[in-house]
A protein has these predicted regions:
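Short aromatic-glycine motifs in intrinsically disordered, low-complexity regions
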Residues: 1-10
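Catalytic strand-loop segment that frames the active site of acyl-thioester-processing enzymes
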Residues: 11-47
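Small-residue-enriched segments and motifs
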Residues: 14-17, 80, 100-102, 129
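Conserved positions in beta-strands of structured domains
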Residues: 17-20, 88, 103-105
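Compact, glycine-rich, soluble single-domain proteins
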Residues: 43-62, 76-77
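HotDog/MaoC-like acyl-thioester-processing domains
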Residues: 61, 93-99, 103-147
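Hydrophobic beta-strand-centered segment that forms part of the acyl-chain substrate-binding groove
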Residues: 61-101
Length: 147
């Protein structure tokens, strides 16, 4: 499958290029390379605070992979917030290799989850955060979108 199969939103804002590792119930490791078509570039730079979107996309892929194991399809998830967001460099450049490792801390049956994410730029820690996400069931999403 392609990354776009795991992230049910516009491919124009898909920032992840490949899945490196997926351990069900535990973690995901994904890779991206900053390119010139990246919609988040400003003056050729990807500002580090936008790394939160890359982390969130890694969790979207993780959730979609978990749903795939249960025979379900990918759905929208929501980034509720973050804590302990630390940035160790101000920006990333075109050509930089980004690897994100996200580990499940808490995931309950309602779809609420807490994940520890680390983002590495060319092998060095570039940012990290604790992300709170909601990945509700399909019925909840249908109802929310119809209102």
């Amino acid at each position: 499958m392609m990354i776009s199969d795991y992230l049910p939103h516009s491919s124009a804002i898909t920032l992840i290029n490949e899945i490196l590792e997926f351990i069900p119930g535990e973690s995901i490791k994904v890779r991206s390379v900053i390119n010139e078509q990246n919609p988040f570039l400003e003056d050729g730079k990807f500002q580090a605070q936008k790394a939160i979107e890359m982390m969130a996309q890694s969790l979207g892929i993780y959730d979609s992979k978990m749903r795939e194991l249960r025979g379900e399809k990918a759905i929208f998830g929501f980034l509720l917030g973050s804590r302990k967001f630390e940035i160790f460099r101000p920006y990333f450049k075109v050509g930089d290799e980004i690897v994100i490792v996200s580990k499940c801390s808490i995931q309950d049956e309602s779809g609420f989850g807490v994940y520890d994410s680390e983002l590495f730029v060319n092998g060095k820690l570039g940012a990290r955060a604790v992300l709170n996400v909601m990945s509700p069931d399909e019925e909840f999403v249908k109802k929310a979108l119809s209102e």
